[in-house]
Amino acid sequence: MSSSPTVPVSNSPSPIPSATRTPYLVLAASLIGISFAAPLIRLSEAAPLVIATWRLGFSLIIVAIALLVGGGWRDWRTLSRSDVFLAGGAGVLLALHFWTWNTSLRYTSVAASVALVNLQPVIIAAISGFWLREPATGRQWFWITVAVVGALIVGLADVPGGIRAIGPALLGAGEGSRALLGDGLALLGAVTAAGYYLIGRRLRQHLALWPYVGLVYGAAFVACVLLCLATQAPLAPQPPRELAIFAGLALGPMLLGHTGMNWALAHLPAFVVNLTVLGEPVGATLLAALLPGIAEVPGPATIVGGALVLTGAILAARR
């Protein structure tokens, strides 16, 4: 990981060089980009798998142009069979992440969904000890517990009647069953995103940005198309309004957001980028409250639970 350029020391204050500012500007733009994901998905009337497929398809058009212009596709010649297998696995997990998380937004609030899906750093910290032989410390387990408590509060906030109604809701009865289903799908989205990150991290160590996202986004696109065919989800034709939403998801959350953060990882410490990702629930919740088509204001319990999830995730991700 490269370091930022050294700034000469002088007695008078001087502006930060543009070369140093650029990664932070990209990171700020990326945060804005990913914050639009949940509100745009909520505004779409298409099936969750269809949204994911078109989002990836539009993204791949731009990725393909970047690969052809920059010649990054040549890096694929050096890939081993295990690399291709890993890329396919990461792509499938990304497809499952989009499917489960997109679906969660049909059942639960934007605030609850984005808070729960951002448990992924906690999940990574918890399973790293078993898979990567990087056991979590006692302090990390404490903050993992805090995040889990926050997730439980978010779930209870979605159930009218609180703890007494949780049993019937889990059995599919009562008004809270739909919200709990959405919360569960958001948690599955966090698990699949954590797996996508852990598997893809190995590929990113020896693959440049565009070859990496080209492989993984391509595998995810194929997986989404196959899932659409298997579930008979209508891929086409789509009305202009939906196509505009799909293009917005590709340009904002996908390319500006996720790809911008992948670029920033080469210029900034990983923990800085990870902390920025955890700003998504704040941005998404504000947008969901302000956009006329959604106008969704979270309740106090959701805010408290979400704050615990984010605090636990931030501190559990640090060693």
Positions of PLM-derived features:
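Hydrophobic alpha-helical transmembrane segments of multi-pass integral membrane proteins
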Residues: 21-26, 50-69, 142-149, 181-188, ...
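Specific alpha-helical transmembrane segments that line the substrate/conduction pathway
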Residues: 50-61, 102-135, 140, 144, ...
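Hydrophobic transmembrane alpha-helices of multi-pass small-molecule transport proteins
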Residues: 63, 67, 127, 136-159, ...
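Hydrophobic/small/kink-forming positions within alpha-helical transmembrane segments
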Residues: 32-35, 57, 91, 95-99, ...
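Glycine-/small-residue-enriched transmembrane alpha-helix faces in small-molecule transporters
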Residues: 1-54, 59, 66, 89-96, ...
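Helix-helix packing/entry segments at the starts of transmembrane helices
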Residues: 113-119, 199-221, 254-290
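Specific transmembrane alpha-helical segments of multi-pass solute transporters/efflux pumps
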Residues: 33, 72-111, 116-117, 153, ...
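C-terminal-most transmembrane helix of multi-pass membrane proteins
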Residues: 4, 56, 156-157, 242-244, ...
